[in-house]
Each structure stands twice: as structure tokens, then as C-alpha cells.
């Protein structure tokens, strides 16, 4: 497992709701936390590690063993209040930062790995992180929420990411979109089918 970088196909995939949690998925979630800590992040969404599943992990403390590890499965955001502009970055767009307007407060409802429903009212940085990670599940990146001027300012960096990915694909070191689509379909088949 690795953190995918822009413009990888799966980053733009609209994730499917999870209907099944098993030991293998729990292990993948543990790996997501490990990757997040290695990259000094506070959140990581399934799409960012090539899992097309509606789930993300968060720990506002950044460091393993500190803070609280939270898993959000099939999150639903509501009661967004107020607006606040703030600087954001993303583990899938390393070393790029930009101003994004987000709601100051948000209510989130989700499930944990035990299938228990929980909810929370968040504000400040926690609200921003939850909105950022939830966007990933819809194939939306923070750069999509920036002003036109902000996007233009980082256009050169984005083009470098695009050229690097094209080069990897040309060298056969990155799968084609069709190969990725097949793998995505396998994940969806395994974890997103209605219970019988």
C-alpha cells in the first residue's frame, strides 16, 4: 500500500459505500494509519491508497501513539455553518498548499470498524480535516475548491505531477486506467455489495 499522487485515476473516483467489514479491511485501515503517520498527515482517505471505499482515517495529533485514531466509514456531513478560509495541503499533492474556504462547523455521522454508528459536531481544524477527507471520497481534491488565481499559481507544479505520472505510465511502471478500473471493481465487489 502506498499514498497515490495527483493525477492518479483513483483519486477522482467517487467511492462506494462499505457494506462489509472483515479482518482484511481492518488490516488495511491499520496500514492507512501507518502511512498517514509516516507522511506526517492528520487524515487519509481510501481513494488516496487505491481503495474505492467510503472510508477515511483521522488523528489530529499527527503522531502515532498520541491523540485518538478515528475511522469514518460511510460518513455523512450535515449542518455546515459559517465559512472560513484556511491553508490546506494534501498527502496526494506533496508540498503544495493553497487557501480553501470551508464551513467553520460541521456535523458528521459515520460508522466505526465495529459497525457502530457515531456522530460528532466539529469546528475549526477538525471540521476542515473532515470536509477535506470527505471530499476525497467524492473524487474532489482541495485544488478543486481553490480560486482560479490560486490554481493558476500552482499550475506549473500540477503539470510536473502530470508529467511524472505520464512518464511512469510510458515506462510501464504505472497501470493503465483500464487495469485500475478492474481492480476498483474487485474492491467494490468485495466490500460494497448489499448483504444477502
Residue ranges and their predicted role:
Residues 1-196:
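Positively charged
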Amino acid at each position: 500500500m502506498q499514498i497515490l499522487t495527483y493525477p492518479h485515476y483513483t483519486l477522482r473516483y467517487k467511492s462506494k459505500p462499505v457494506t462489509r467489514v472483515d479482518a482484511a479491511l481492518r488490516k488495511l485501515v491499520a496500514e492507512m494509519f501507518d502511512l498517514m503517520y509516516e507522511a506526517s498527515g492528520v487524515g487519509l482517505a481510501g481513494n488516496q491508497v487505491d481503495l474505492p471505499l467510503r472510508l477515511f482515517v483521522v488523528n489530529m495529533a499527527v503522531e502515532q501513539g498520541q491523540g485518538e485514531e478515528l475511522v469514518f466509514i460511510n460518513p455523512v456531513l450535515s449542518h455546515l455553518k459559517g465559512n472560513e478560509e484556511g491553508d490546506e495541503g494534501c498527502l496526494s499533492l506533496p508540498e503544495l498548499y493553497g487557501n480553501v474556504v470551508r464551513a467553520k462547523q460541521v456535523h458528521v455521522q459515520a460508522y466505526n470498524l465495529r459497525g457502530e454508528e457515531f456522530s460528532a459536531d466539529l469546528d475549526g481544524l477538525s471540521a476542515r480535516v473532515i470536509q477535506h477527507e470527505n471530499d476525497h471520497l467524492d473524487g474532489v481534491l482541495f485544488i478543486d475548491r481553490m480560486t482560479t488565481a490560486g490554481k493558476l499559481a500552482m499550475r506549473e507544479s500540477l503539470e510536473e505531477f502530470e508529467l511524472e505520472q505520464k512518464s511512469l505510465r510510458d515506462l510501464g511502471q504505472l497501470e493503465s486506467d483500464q487495469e485500475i478500473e478492474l481492480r476498483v471493481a474487485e474492491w467494490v465487489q468485495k466490500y460494497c455489495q448489499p448483504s444477502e
